Amino acid sequence: MGGGDLNLKKSFHPALRRNQQAVWDEEQKALAERKRTQQRLDEIKEERAKEEVQRQLEAAGGKKKVDRVEWMYQGPNDGQTGTTEETEAYLLGKRRIDNLIKGTEHKKLEKDAGTESFMALQNANTARDTAAKIREDPLLAIKRQEQAAYEAMMNDPARRRQLLASRGIDEDKKDKSRRKEDRHRRRHRHRSADGEDRHHRRRRSYSRSQSPRRRDGSREDRHRRRRDDSRDRHSRRRRDGSDEEGRRDRDNRSGGDRHRHDGDRRHSDEPRDERRDNRRDERPRDNNRQYSRRSYPSDRRPRHNEEDDKAKEEERQRKLAAMQSAATELDVDRQERLADLEKREQAAREADNKARERGGDRGFVNKLHQQAEHKGLAERMGGARRGYQKDDD
């Protein structure tokens, strides 16, 4: 049994061929590197010798040489005429640089890349194209579908109530706060209207008291006063919105008109001194009338309570109607689901009956096969033995 030298089986043994090949390759690389280094040293020596000769010539009175990096301006990348791709193509030997040096290809590129082509591309984005792009935008279509679904859900009172409940918002409290704000706004509006009307009446009474007292019994003054009283009565009746208050106001106004007409007649018949006395007697009556007018808006407060009760009742009726509609919708959905389930069960029963009718002819044979599959070995041997006995008989 000769196994040879066991050292040759080691991977690091120097007698192996692959190890010798690796050593030889490394030696060749070192020699090539030494040759390149020596060549570069020789080139440096030659350049130094040339520089020394040039320096000696310049010192002897020769022409001076200007040191410039001309190698940066040489090659295919001549200013704006070249690109990185062209430089790589030139280095790989796939492209000639004659045309780049001459400049003909650069001019051709300038013609092709003019402003006309750029503007032609810009003209494609017209208003119609932009509208079509916006209309066919899938994200915009998705947003529209989401908005439509949200609006449908908010229009449904039951689902809207569920959504608000999930967010922790009480719709009843929200409605109460809204009604309170509306009530406060109405009260503020009525108070401002009453203040303006009171100020207007005060200014009119003051202007009447400051005006001269001549021609009180004339027909034009009576007509003017009657027209002013009717305008005030109409505005107050429209603001109050009550037939009872309007009727009371008309009675008061008619009584005042009768007193005024009687006083006018008395003024026209009586002497001037008696007329002055009657005017003094009538002043407290006018003051009482103005006081009654000022105290009139205080009777309107119960009417606001009635309006609030009416608004609450309407809101309650609206909520009740919404609850009833939601319950009706739930009942309709439940009935539809039950009807659909019943239809499915009926279709399944019909399919089962058809399958039974189709397999009724082969039912007996299938039953025999099933019985044969479930028989044991003893039963089969016993049946075969009985068959043999019958044959012997």
UniProtKB/Swiss-Prot annotation:
InterPro entries: CIR_N_dom (IPR019339), CWC25 (IPR022209), CWC25_splicing_factor (IPR051376). Residues 38-55, 168-180, 213-232, 240-288, 296-318, 331-361 have a biased composition (Basic and acidic residues). Keywords: Coiled coil, mRNA processing, mRNA splicing, Nucleus, Spliceosome. Residues 38-61, 151-393 are annotated as: Disordered. Pfam families: Cir_N, CWC25. The keyword Nucleus applies. Its main location: nucleus. One of its GO terms (cellular component) is U2-type spliceosomal complex. Residues 25-65, 310-358 form a coiled coil. GO terms for biological process: mRNA splicing, via spliceosome. Belongs to the CWC25 family. Associated with the spliceosome. Involved in pre-mRNA splicing. This is Pre-mRNA-splicing factor CWC25. It comes from Gibberella zeae (strain ATCC MYA-4620 / CBS 123657 / FGSC 9075 / NRRL 31084 / PH-1) (Wheat head blight fungus).
